[in-house]
């Protein structure tokens, strides 16, 4: 099957035809390096890693250029640096924060089994390209200078009689709708509420560079111009695929399109726009205010979730088993289920080597808009048919190769009984809980769950149920002889 990908701009699945098959070019928005990456950040990293692998398979390992940027200039970085290193000059503190956070990010995504991108540019290394694009936009009448800022005018873009796309096309919004929905407290130097910043003056002590457009005061770039500059430098004026999370469609990606197309007078910045769906935690949007903000590092290195640290491959599996455009509800139960699948696969494979050729049906699944969930269903059939060499080849292709670590962490409710090839990796051969609880401790949790159910606090009830499940305790709700609700429990087998 030829590769077909869903394009956010056209809202349809289309045959993928690279501009230059000898150099397929993809850009994905990367992290702003001011704090540990959270599990929502992990999803696009993993999704586009699988796409990178597929493109390399289809077009050749040396014929794909994957660019994922590092944003190392941002207000959040400045705030973090000032808070963490109050005794240092701000620029030095910023350097410490960005270098440390970038290392942490790389450690985390390496643990998730992701390949490094071909190029990983930093925003601060591309200030010259940003100034060049801004000067072009001002000269073309698409941007203007006001109060030492440079601002882009979507109205000017839409008024241009040229090949340019309509501002708002990617997000499927009209300019009138955006103006009506703009906040009341619009900066006084803006001509229109929808105008956005390309460049702004720096405050004393902040990072600063010589400004474009004849501005004498030094300043720093806005967020959106950074990606336009880095993609242009490494991929050209127009390239094949631009990816990121669905939350970036507007305003970030919409503004990237505006900047790049107006600067280079093209009708498209990228031939295909791809966006992965939202991630929720236990049914709610993840946020620090709700107390459900989970970092990749917490899952990999602490026992906060499920009573033990998690292997990166397990998180990877939980992220890809759902189609990339669908939302994900992250739960400890989902990690347990993914762990059980990988554990079963690795256990059955034993010391079998991978097949030399990937099954065609497996590649066909992935070529259908990166349908990894369908590919996983096919992998289950390989296990059922005892085609373990083919199963291992498909696992390796999707980034799963750490059998020892996966097998060393026993899934909830599973007896350890491994073939000799992996016996040394196992933690034991007895049926015990991952984190043993006393009978009274279990019953205390069940009583707390019963009380939560009585007051209709089902979120808390489900949380306790999932916590017990993660510890190997299966609970069952029923009624006693008098018809009253009762909950029983047993150690899962």
Curated annotation (Swiss-Prot):
Top EC group: ligase
Annotated InterPro entries: Cys-tRNA-ligase, Cys-tRNA/MSH_ligase, CysS_C, Rossmann-like_a/b/a_fold, tRNA-synt_1_cat_dom, tRNAsynth_Ia_anticodon-bd
Subcellular location: Cytoplasm
Molecular function in Gene Ontology: ATP binding; cysteine-tRNA ligase activity; zinc ion binding
Enzyme Commission number(s) of this protein: 6.1.1.16
Residue spans crossing the bilayer: none
Cofactor note: Binds 1 zinc ion per subunit.
Superkingdom of origin: Bacteria
Pfam families, per database record: CysS_C (PF23493), tRNA-synt_1e (PF01406)
Major subcellular site: cytoplasm
Residue numbers binding Zn(2+): 29, 227, 252, 256
GO CC, alphabetical: cytosol
Reaction equation(s) it catalyzes: tRNA(Cys) + L-cysteine + ATP = L-cysteinyl-tRNA(Cys) + AMP + diphosphate
Cofactor(s), names only, from the UniProt record: Zn(2+)
SUPFAM superfamilies xrefs: Anticodon-binding domain of a subclass of class I aminoacyl-tRNA synthetases, Nucleotidylyl transferase
Disulfide links within the chain: none
The entry's keywords: Aminoacyl-tRNA synthetase, ATP-binding, Cytoplasm, Ligase, Metal-binding, Nucleotide-binding, Protein biosynthesis, Zinc
Binding site for ATP: 288
Record family assignment: Belongs to the class-I aminoacyl-tRNA synthetase family.
Subunit structure: Monomer.
Name of protein: Cysteine--tRNA ligase
Native organism: Rhodopseudomonas palustris (strain HaA2)
Organism lineage string: Bacteria, Pseudomonadati, Pseudomonadota, Alphaproteobacteria, Hyphomicrobiales
């Amino acid at each position: 099957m030829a590769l077909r990908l869903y394009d956010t701009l056209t809202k349809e699945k289309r045959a993928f035809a690279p501009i230059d098959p000898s150099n397929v070019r993809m850009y994905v928005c990367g992290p702003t390096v001011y704090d540990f990456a959270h599990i929502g950040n992990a999803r696009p990293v993993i999704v586009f890693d699988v796409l990178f692998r597929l493109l390399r398979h289809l077009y050749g390992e040396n014929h794909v250029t994957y660019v994922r940027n590092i944003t190392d200039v941002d207000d959040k970085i400045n705030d973090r640096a000032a808070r963490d290193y109050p005794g240092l000059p701000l620029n030095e503190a910023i350097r410490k924060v960005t270098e440390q956070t970038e290392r942490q990010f790389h450690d985390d995504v390496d643990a998730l089994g992701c390949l490094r991108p071909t190029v990983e540019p930093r925003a601060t290394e591309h200030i010259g390209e940003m100034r060049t694009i801004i000067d072009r936009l001002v000269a073309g009448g698409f941007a203007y200078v006001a109060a030492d800022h440079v601002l882009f005018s979507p109205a000017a873009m839409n008024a241009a009689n040229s090949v340019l796309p309509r501002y708002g096309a990617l997000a499927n919004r009209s300019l009138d709708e955006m103006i009506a929905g703009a906040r009341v407290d619009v900066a006084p130097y803006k001509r229109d509420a929808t105008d956005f910043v390309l460049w702004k003056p720096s405050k004393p002590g902040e990072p600063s560079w010589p400004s474009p457009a004849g501005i004498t005061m030094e300043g720093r770039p806005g967020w959106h111009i950074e990606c336009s500059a880095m993609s242009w430098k490494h991929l050209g004026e127009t390239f094949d695929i631009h990816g990121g999370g669905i939350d970036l469609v507007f305003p970030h990606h919409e503004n990237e399109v505006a900047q790049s197309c107006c600067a280079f007078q093209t009708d498209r910045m990228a031939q295909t726009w791809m966006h992965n769906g939202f991630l929720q935690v236990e049914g709610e949007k993840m946020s620090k205010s709700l107390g459900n903000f989970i970092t990749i590092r917490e899952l990999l290195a602490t026992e906060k979730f499920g009573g033990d640290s998690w292997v990166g491959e397990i998180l990877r599996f939980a992220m890809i088993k759902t189609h990339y455009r669908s939302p994900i509800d992250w739960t400890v139960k989902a990690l347990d289920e993914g762990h059980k699948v990988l554990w079963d696969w690795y256990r059955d494979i034993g010391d079998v080597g991978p097949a030399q050729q990937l099954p065609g049906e497996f590649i066909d699944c992935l070529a259908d808009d990166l349908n990894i969930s369908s590919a996983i269903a096919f992998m289950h059939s390989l296990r059922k048919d005892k085609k373990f060499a083919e199963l291992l080849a498909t696992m390796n292709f999707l980034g799963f190769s750490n059998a020892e670590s996966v097998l060393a962490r026993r899934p909830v409710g599973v007896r350890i009984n491994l073939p000799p090839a992996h016996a040394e990796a196992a933690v034991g051969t007895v049926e015990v809980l991952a984190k043993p609880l006393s009978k009274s401790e279990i019953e205390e949790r069940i009583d707390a769950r019963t009380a939560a159910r009585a007051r209709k606090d089902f979120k808390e009830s489900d949380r306790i149920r999932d916590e017990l499940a993660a510890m190997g305790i299966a609970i069952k709700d029923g009624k006693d002889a008098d018809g009253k609700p009762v909950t029983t429990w047993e150690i899962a087998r």
